[in-house]
Amino acid sequence: MSEETSTIIFEHPLNEKMRSWLRIENSLIQLNSFQSINSLSSALSFFRAVSEFIEVLDRGEIRAELLKELEKRQKKLQQWLSFPNVDKEIVSHIINELSESACALSKAPRIGQHLKQDKIISLVKQRLSIPGGCCSFDVPTLHLWLNLPQTVRTEKLTCWQEGLYPLQNALNALLTLIRQSDTFKPVLSHNGFYQDSTEEGELLRIKLLASQQIYPQVSGHKNRYAIRFLPLDSEHGTIPSELPFEISCC
């Protein structure tokens, strides 16, 4: 895709539940982006991501919320099977995927507990808020660990990541279903502003051309939302009187 036609999708939650899910998803993406830890800088980047993930996780009962939502979605899809002109094979496949994800999540140990109880993570986490607080004399355990064979660190990293797979798979299945519940529609904003109403919307998705160098600021809730478009260059950038973009309310 050329730079002229490449697009950016901005997502905005319309309730606190979705806000929490998106933050956890973002943390999981960061954690899984690490293929190896081979330096102090990569180690600190990983441990900061772990620390943020633990904090987000501690703000709610994520397992109970996800299991409840997965069950709700399965029941709704079961009703679809009785509708005419529905692709029963696809719907049944989605139901099975949600069911398997829910089963794995319900059987998994307490989410994130293996991270909270890990000695290295605990030691580093305590020092992250201190500027320059992870020198070798501050955390000699980390210094030793970073000088062990790469295979040892990779094995540990894999263990940390795999312990989150039940949560990751369940969340991915749910968010994919939500994102696919509505299609993008072309609309126009006037003088950099757009507003609309929705019935029980959970997630707002806004698609803009990257070349426009414009981003949205969203305010709203499940029934109504407003979007203000702003230029990346706050001093010299401008917003056209009519701005075409695409929107999806899931």
Curated annotation (Swiss-Prot):
Interacts with FtsZ. This is Cell division protein ZapD. It comes from Proteus mirabilis (strain HI4320). GO terms for biological process: division septum assembly; FtsZ-dependent cytokinesis. It is found in: Cytoplasm. InterPro entries: ZapD, ZapD_C, ZapD_sf. NCBIfam families: PRK05287.1-1 (NF003653). One of its GO terms (cellular component) is cytoplasm. Gene3D superfamilies: YacF-like, YacF-like domains.
